[in-house]
Swiss-Prot record:
Keywords: Cell membrane, Membrane, Transmembrane, Transmembrane helix
Main location: membrane
Protein species of origin: Bacillus licheniformis
Any single GO CC term annotated in Swiss-Prot or TrEMBL for this entry: plasma membrane
Membrane-related topology note: Multi-pass membrane protein
List of catalytic residues: S402
Record note on modification: Carboxylation occurs on two lysine residues. Carboxylation at 'Lys-405' activates the active site serine residue for acylation. On acylation, the lysine side chain experiences a spontaneous decarboxylation that entraps the sensor in its activated state.
Modified residues (N6-carboxylysine): K405
Identification of the protein by name: Regulatory protein BlaR1
Family as reported in the entry's similarity comment: Belongs to the peptidase M56 family.
Length: 601
């Protein structure tokens, strides 16, 4: 997946907005076919889906929308004219294979655009946060100026109402000169604030008001109010979020009205409607960002509340059954769809370890030498134990660069495109920045000099459909084949160091059930050297963006007389992040652990 923020986030918003549009349509079509409570709960759970883009569903995968993501991810083109010779000096005795052969990727201005949109979004969030805090200063002012109710008759009525709805949490009942309509706020310590002048209301009318506000407290509607404010801050740019939030607030009041009507005697139903109208006539103007529940509503929505009162009747078993069915279907759709939205919005896919034998060690000094960050993963076959440095980097996905050529070669062999003894390809005369590339190649020379044009030609002969099937069958990283010939260079295909180690082990043990002769051929092509009876095999990879070293890989394994160690190093930085650097880090760590001693030490 792309490391871009804006495009994946935008795609998630498009998908969520489409989902919200469908939900709104369903609610309108089924307005009288489901209960008022179901309408409210559907709105709430639909809005809960907006959390999904920020939830890391690490163990779920979705490829339904990869084609959309690729519109904005890693928009780059392979540039031969801007290729940069980044060949470094060899490391000690490894002079024969530690070199950086790589073509530069010319990255478009998408990162600048992405950063600009990200800045605009953050600015909008900051403005909305300030506006929300300012709007909710009213609650602080009300608290400072409230007067605790000490009227015995009113307190008696208040406690009677609490008993009727079986609600026993402590609630502070107060009055304030700053409001004209009853208001409720607070979660841990709920407040019900009445207007200062309550003499105009009869006992029955006051009972209607108290029951309504107490139901808000009992149902913890204040949590929903805070949640709706948070959504408006984060998704300030999405009109559907604002619309659905407003609907949820109205339906919250309607469902409270319905609960009150079920509690009241039927003869008081008309009185309840009159109370709603009375407070609406004196409603004061308040902000939609206020994290509180007001008894009064806007004139536009008061009609819906009055219709609920006039048409009130207890839900029939059939209506309850239909409501339960619709709610279950909507909930199922949300649970099924939100992991995909989460993966779309994540900047970098991460795969965590399952319940395995893992130890963490600090190898930061080896990475600090190159002023770069990175991750290291080692797997001990005999002990079935992982050793990891930097869990986050080791389980995050990156473009595989030339390390993918190991599996490109394997597929070409399996497909019959080449064989061990017949893998020759003729150079077409195109001038490349490395003399090793400007000549005919076979599998072994191409793997040794990491000749990109050779493996691109193999991929073209294999075909896109076969490549897609292959990537999925071996579960290579994110399995994203999007840009023919360039997908392992431009970042659409990505894999983590942990996944590199695991797939190398599967390759080594032939868990793919390929021809063993093809496995052995690839093993021979990546065999690097032998030291003290131990054999080192592996492949480096270097990412060069806009002519600058960007990242480096070194993956491989060490065979001893009685064990095999699989490893992967990924390094990224601004100056010295290359395959040769990753190789030096890996060899230093392997030497320190006594797995592959350096000849020079």
């Amino acid at each position: 997946m792309s490391s871009s923020f804006f495009i994946p986030f935008l795609v998630s918003q498009i998908l969520l907005s489409l989902f919200f549009s469908i939900i709104i349509l369903i609610k309108k079509l089924l307005r009288t076919q489901i209960t008022v409570g179901t309408h409210y709960y559907i709105s709430v759970i639909s809005l809960l889906a907006l959390i999904a883009p920020f939830i890391p569903f690490h163990f779920l995968k979705s490829h339904h929308f990869d084609w959309i993501l690729n519109l904005g991810g890693a928009q780059s083109a392979l540039s031969q004219t801007h290729s940069t010779d980044k060949t470094t000096e060899a490391i000690g005795q490894h002079v024969n294979w530690v070199q950086d052969f790589s073509l530069s990727i010319e990255q478009s201005s998408s990162k600048m655009i992405d950063s600009a949109f990200f800045a605009v979004w953050i600015l909008g969030v900051a403005v909305m946060l300030l506006a929300t805090l300012y709007s909710n200063l009213k609650i602080g002012k009300i608290k400072k100026n409230l007067q605790i109710v000490n009227n015995k008759e009113l307190l008696s009525l208040f406690h009677t109402c609490k008993e009727e709805i079986r609600f026993h949490q402590k609630v502070i009942l107060s009055r304030s000169p700053l409001i004209k309509s009853p208001i409720t706020f607070g979660v841990i310590r709920p407040y019900i604030i009445l207007p200062k002048d309550i003499s105009m209301f009869s006992a029955d009318e006051m009972k209607c008001v108290l029951l309504h506000e107490l139901y808000h407290c009992k149902r913890k509607d204040m949590l929903i109010n805070y949640f709706l404010c948070l959504l408006k801050i984060v998704y300030w740019f999405n009109p559907l979020v604002w619309y659905l939030s407003k609907e949820a607030k109205t339906e919250m009041e309607i469902s409270c009205d319905f609960a009150v009507l079920k509690t009241l005697d039927k003869k008081l139903h008309l009185k309840y409607g009159e109370v709603i109208l009375k407070f609406t006539s004196i409603k004061q103007r308040t902000s939609s960002l206020l994290a509180a529940s007001e008894f009064s509503s806007s004139y536009k929505h008061i009609k819906r509340r009055i219709v609920t009162v006039v048409n009130f009747q207890t839900a029939s078993p059939l209506l309850k059954a239909k409501s339960a069915l619709v709610f279950t279907l909507v909930l199922g759709a949300i649970l099924a769809g939100t992991p995909s939205v989460s993966i779309l919005a994540m900047q970098k896919e991460t795969r965590f370890l399952p319940g395995t034998n893992v130890e963490y060690e600090d190898y930061s000094t080896f990475f600090d030498k190159f002023s770069a960050s990175g991750g290291f993963v080692l797997f001990n076959s005999n002990r079935k134990k992982y050793t990891i440095y930097n869990r986050k980097e080791s389980t995050s996905r990156f473009a595989p660069a030339s390390t993918y050529k190991v599996f490109s070669a394997l597929l070409a062999l399996e497909s019959g495109i080449i064989t061990k003894n017949d893998s020759h390809m003729t150079w077409d005369g195109t001038q490349y920045p490395y003399k090793e590339w400007n000549q005919d190649q076979d599998l072994f020379s191409a793997m040794s000099s990491s000749t990109t044009w050779y493996f691109q030609k193999l991929d073209r002969q294999i075909g896109e459909d076969h490549l897609r099937h292959y990537l999925k069958s071996i579960h290579y990283g994110n399995e994203d084949f999007s840009v023919p010939a360039d997908y392992w260079l431009d970042g659409s295909l990505q894999i983590s160091p942990l996944e590199q180690v695991n797939i190398l082990k599967k390759f080594y043990d032939n868990e793919f059930d390929f021809k063993q002769s093809n496995i052995e051929t690839v093993k021979d092509s990546i065999r690097l050297e032998e030291s003290n009876g131990r054999v080192l095999s592996g492949k480096t990879g270097t990412s060069v963006i806009n002519g600058e070293l960007h990242a480096g890989w070194f993956i491989g394994y060490v065979e001893t007389a009685d064990n095999t160690f699989f490893f992967a190093v990924h390094i990224q930085g601004e100056k010295r992040a290359a395959g040769s650097s990753a190789a030096e880090i890996a060899l230093s760590i392997l030497d320190k652990k006594g797995i592959y001693p350096s000849v020079s030490r």
